[in-house]
């Protein structure tokens, strides 16, 4: 697949056919994804390939806690789980909010689920002393996760990067035997997408790009 086509058509697939994703194809996908950049080329990623139905169901169930709050905040017009604005919904509202099936069922029903982790001993968390949530470590793991989706798209498969289960990271670590110094970064269901989107909606360049300064004129169209 031509690169620009892949960039414009790799969507978040959450519904899959019954077609398997064979080990040899998955190995090819990971073989391409490993060429992602990482700080110092330390390549701190680790991947757990999950096919066992019970384990996939457990990972889906672990996504429900964060998914419930996500849905409650979204229904209240909030940006869910952001660290700037405190949630305006109370605990009781969150507790009685049903979890939208699309947030958890893909993990339980996908042919394969990848649990992507990163070694915290090798990533540079340069923003660790700032008075905000740390995000810089993600530069050494999420390009790898995105490469997985691009390579899967090239091979005729799809998936998505989900993070809801990470709110229950201790339980995931216990379930999968993950060492303490690793962080769980994503739970990625993969398979043959039940449908394909060819027209993704994104903001135009001029809405997010400025010249020279934050308050500079728009760049692009």
Regions found by a protein language model. Name each.
Residues 65-68, 174-190:
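Short, conserved aromatic-histidine micro-motifs
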Residues 49-140:
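Glycine/small-residue-rich phosphate/adenosyl-binding loop
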Residues 29, 33, 114-174:
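Small-aliphatic-rich amphipathic alpha-helix that forms the alpha element of a beta-alpha
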Residues 15-16, 46, 158-162:
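Short catalytic-loop micro-motif centered on adjacent basic/acidic residues
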Residues 1-24, 28:
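Short acidic N-proximal helix/loop "leader" segments that mark the beginning
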Residues 41-44, 108-110, 183:
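Short, basic and Ser/Thr-rich N-terminal targeting/leader segments
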Residues 35-41:
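Glycine-rich phosphate/pyrophosphate-binding beta-alpha loops
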Residues 6, 12-13, 84-85, 183-221:
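C-terminal helix-cap and adjacent tail motif
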């Amino acid at each position: 697949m031509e690169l620009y086509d892949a960039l414009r058509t790799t969507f978040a697939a959450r519904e899959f056919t019954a077609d398997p994703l064979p080990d040899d194809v998955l190995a090819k996908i990971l073989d391409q994804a490993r060429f992602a950049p990482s700080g110092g080329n330390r390549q701190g990623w680790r991947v757990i390939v999950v096919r066992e139905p019970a384990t996939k169901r457990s990972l889906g169930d672990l996504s429900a806690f964060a998914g419930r709050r996500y849905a409650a905040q979204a229904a209240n017009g909030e940006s869910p789980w952001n660290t700037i604005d405190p949630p305006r919904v109370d605990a009781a509202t969150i507790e009685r909010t049903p979890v939208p099936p699309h947030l958890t069922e893909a993990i339980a029903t996908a042919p394969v689920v990848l649990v992507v982790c990163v070694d915290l001993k090798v990533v540079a968390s340069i923003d660790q002393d700032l008075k905000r949530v740390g995000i810089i470590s993600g530069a050494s793991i999420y390009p790898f996760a995105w490469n997985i989706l691009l390579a899967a798209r090239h091979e005729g498969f799809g998936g998505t990067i989900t993070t809801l289960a990470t709110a229950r990271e201790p339980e995931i670590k216990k379930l999968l035997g993950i060492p303490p110094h690793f962080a769980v970064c994503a739970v990625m269901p993969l398979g043959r997408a039940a449908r394909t989107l060819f027209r993704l909606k994104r903001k135009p360049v001029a809405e997010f790009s400025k010249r020279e300064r934050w308050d500079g004129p728009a760049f692009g169209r």
